[in-house]
């Protein structure tokens, strides 16, 4: 299941509509440009063969991929991998399956893995929705992290947002009973949509009480990234939404 793809995003598909009325067209990303650094390219060569998994339209063998059986957390869109590496270091007893299509971000996380000697992360450089559909069996996950997905601020672009009912239904089905789904955003209108969508999913239950408006306190495991700290200093809010599988 392991490959070392070339650190190039040239062949990534464009972002189609993610309108909830067309669930087959949901994608977890939009195309972005960016260059890998020398250090990131070196990490691809040095540790990519071990930590990058090949996408295949068949159920993933978690034990083979990670070399052990352990609770598995899916992360969708890890950016430059800062929070991912922090959480993985705090939880060596858990496996982290991380999806990101943007090559500089993948290279950055590989570099962190190498520098911090993290053995519990595996990366799929592929659209997360196809990974969920074709590689993750029902009841296979212990948790899901979706931190700061693109908010698509303009109303006409809201339909492109990742967190919509079709995707949440897929994720809920793949969580084990008692597993959790944790979303975080710094855009209040998106936070409201996330809360509404997750609340409407029958297989999920909110962990927060009404006193917080349905939003959860920031879990200790999620670090404040440089980006988030910058936003807080500018007076921006951050909303965490944490639901569990019933």
From Swiss-Prot:
Active site: residue positions? 150
What SUPFAM superfamilies does the record tag this protein with? S-adenosyl-L-methionine-dependent methyltransferases
What is the name of this protein? tRNA (guanine-N(7)-)-methyltransferase
Alphabetized InterPro entries for the sequence: SAM-dependent_MTases_sf (IPR029063), tRNA_(Gua-N-7)_MeTrfase_Trmb (IPR003358), tRNA_methyltr_TrmB_bact (IPR055361)
Which pathway is this protein engaged in?
Answer: tRNA modification; N(7)-methylguanine-tRNA biosynthesis
Task: Read off the Gene3D superfamilies from this record.
Answer: Vaccinia Virus protein VP39
Question: NCBIfam families of this UniProt entry?
Answer: tRNA (guanosine(46)-N7)-methyltransferase TrmB
Record keyword Acetylation present: no
- PANTHER family named among the record's database cross-references: 3-DEOXY-D-MANNO-OCTULOSONIC-ACID TRANSFERASE/TRNA GUANINE-N 7 - -METHYLTRANSFERASE (PTHR23417), PENTACOTRIPEPTIDE-REPEAT REGION OF PRORP DOMAIN-CONTAINING PROTEIN (PTHR23417:SF14)
Care to name a GO molecular-function term for this sequence? tRNA (guanine(46)-N7)-methyltransferase activity
Region labeled Disordered — which residues?
1-26
What EC number(s) would the UniProt record show? 2.1.1.33
The cysteines covalently paired via disulfide bonds are none
**List of residues binding S-adenosyl-L-methionine:** 75, 100, 127, 150
Q: Which UniProt keywords apply?
A: Methyltransferase, S-adenosyl-L-methionine, Transferase, tRNA processing
Q: Which organism is it from?
A: Polaromonas sp. (strain JS666 / ATCC BAA-500)
GO cellular component terms given for this protein: tRNA methyltransferase complex
Residues of the region (Interaction with RNA) are: 156-161
Tell me what reaction this enzyme catalyses: guanosine(46) in tRNA + S-adenosyl-L-methionine = N(7)-methylguanosine(46) in tRNA + S-adenosyl-L-homocysteine
Q: What does this protein do?
A: Catalyzes the formation of N(7)-methylguanine at position 46 (m7G46) in tRNA.
Specify whether Transferase is a keyword of the entry: yes
């Amino acid at each position: 299941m392991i490959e070392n793809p070339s650190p190039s995003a040239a062949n990534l598909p464009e972002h189609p509509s993610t309108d909830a009325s067309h669930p087959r067209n949901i994608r977890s990303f939009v195309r972005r440009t960016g260059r890998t650094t020398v250090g990131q390219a070196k990490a691809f060569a040095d540790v990519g063969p071990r930590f990058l998994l090949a996408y295949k339209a068949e159920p993933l063998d978690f034990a083979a991929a990670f070399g052990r059986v352990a609770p598995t957390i899916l992360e969708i869109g890890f950016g430059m991998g800062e929070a991912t590496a922090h959480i993985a270091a705090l939880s060596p007893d858990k496996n982290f399956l991380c999806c990101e299509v943007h090559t500089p971000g993948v290279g950055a996380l590989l570099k962190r893995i190498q520098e911090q000697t993290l053995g519990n992360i595996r990366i799929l450089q592929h659209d997360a929705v196809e990974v969920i559909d074709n590689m993750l069996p029902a009841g296979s996950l212990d948790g899901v992290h979706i931190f700061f997905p693109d908010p698509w601020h303009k109303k006409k672009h809201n339909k492109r947002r990742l967190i919509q009912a079709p995707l949440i239904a897929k994720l809920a089905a793949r969580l084990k009973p008692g597993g959790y789904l944790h979303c975080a955003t710094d855009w209040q209108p998106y936070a409201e949509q996330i809360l509404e969508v997750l609340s409407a999913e029958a297989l999920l239950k909110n962990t927060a009480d009404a006193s917080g408006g349905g939003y959860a306190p920031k879990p200790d495991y999620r670090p404040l990234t440089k980006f988030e700290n910058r936003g807080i200093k500018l007076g921006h809010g951050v909303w965490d939404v944490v639901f569990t599988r019933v």
